[in-house]
């Protein structure tokens, strides 16, 4: 959303043009990552002449580097140093100063809400995947993409839209669950007829 708002483009357009989409192997949630440009030495698509073209909207992973952020289910935030051999300039700084330099504290509440959302959805998706037939699994993934990445207006604040999308998503997941239950009942009845 941040990049789309910076570029003034719809979120789906930005995702298709600049990102690689996948489903997390562990989380089973949709994941968007900036797609490296092979012709540019596998660098970020927004790296132009050694500068970030979207610096004001850069992803958290870029703003934090070489630090990484960890958020618990309870919303506790921690930072740690990633091992790096990038060959860049080495400097010493206090974590708080480093984070403030890149305006990380201002977006921490959003990061916490996003992380907690994803952690809760991991559990929900795992349970639903065990119940759903493949067609309903695919529909669920489409709904997740909508709620987490695509159903956003770039002129509106992110968090209220996320909250609205999560309410919508819960309704949609309940509809899919109800459809699956009805199919299961019909299937069970048809098996009973065959067995008679």
Residue ranges and their predicted role:
Residues 1-196:
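Short loop/turn segments that flank or connect secondary-structure elements
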């Amino acid at each position: 959303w941040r990049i789309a708002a910076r570029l003034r483009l719809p979120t789906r357009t930005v995702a298709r043009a600049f990102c690689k989409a996948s489903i997390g192997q562990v989380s089973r949630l949709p994941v968007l990552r900036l797609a490296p440009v092979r012709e540019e030495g596998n660098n970020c698509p927004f790296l132009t002449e050694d500068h970030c073209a979207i610096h004001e909207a850069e992803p958290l992973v870029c703003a934090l580097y070489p630090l990484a952020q960890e958020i618990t289910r309870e919303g506790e935030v921690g930072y740690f140093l990633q091992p790096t051999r990038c060959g860049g300039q080495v400097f010493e700084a206090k974590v708080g100063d480093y984070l403030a330099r890149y305006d990380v504290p201002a977006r921490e509440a959003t990061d916490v809400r996003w992380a907690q959302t994803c952690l809760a959805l991991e559990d929900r998706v795992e349970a639903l995947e065990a119940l759903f037939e493949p067609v309903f699994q695919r529909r669920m993934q489409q709904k997740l993409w909508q709620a987490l990445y695509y159903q956003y207006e770039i002129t509106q604040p992110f968090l209220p839209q996320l909250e609205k999308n999560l309410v919508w998503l819960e309704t949609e997941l309940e509809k899919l669950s109800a459809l699956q239950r009805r199919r299961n009942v019909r299937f069970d009845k048809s098996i009973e007829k065959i067995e008679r």
